[in-house]
Amino acid sequence: MRILIAFAAVVLADCSSGPSPERNATREPWYGQTIVQLASIDRQAENAFKAGKSDQAAALIQQGQPLMDRLLAVPKPTLEAVEAASDLDDLYGRMLLSNRHYGWARMFFQKNVARWKHWTPQTPGTESRLKQANSAIEECDRHIGD
């Protein structure tokens, strides 16, 4: 009798439904809203940097960092999210480069190389971003020995 009960328990356990499918966070409303927020911060920080307001640009970059982290924490972030994150890192790298912090700047540009080198599918836009990041690294490397 115990064997029959054990067998029934195994069969019933095996028939249970599997784990529920994971929700795709990129389809949640917060995800799209966060991309819009980060892209807006990117533009504001870029404009501040171009206007010579480095402190304001730096504050905006800090404000965008948690948004970037949240967007990239999902299993498969969208192209738009990665582009917004890339723009933030590129701007920060350029700011560091302009302040002669070549090693730190190189690190931020290297993050973009890693992003775009491994992005699939490759598009003209992602290839252009990869080329831009590699050029920025070359610029850093020219100055590191100074």
Where are these regions (language model features)?
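Alpha-helical junction/boundary sensor with strong preference for TPR arrays
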Residues: 68-75, 115-123
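Residue signature of alpha-solenoid helical repeat architecture, marking inter-repeat boundaries
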Residues: 28, 32-36, 76-83, 128
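Bacterial Sec signal peptide processing site at the extreme N-terminus
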Residues: 16-29
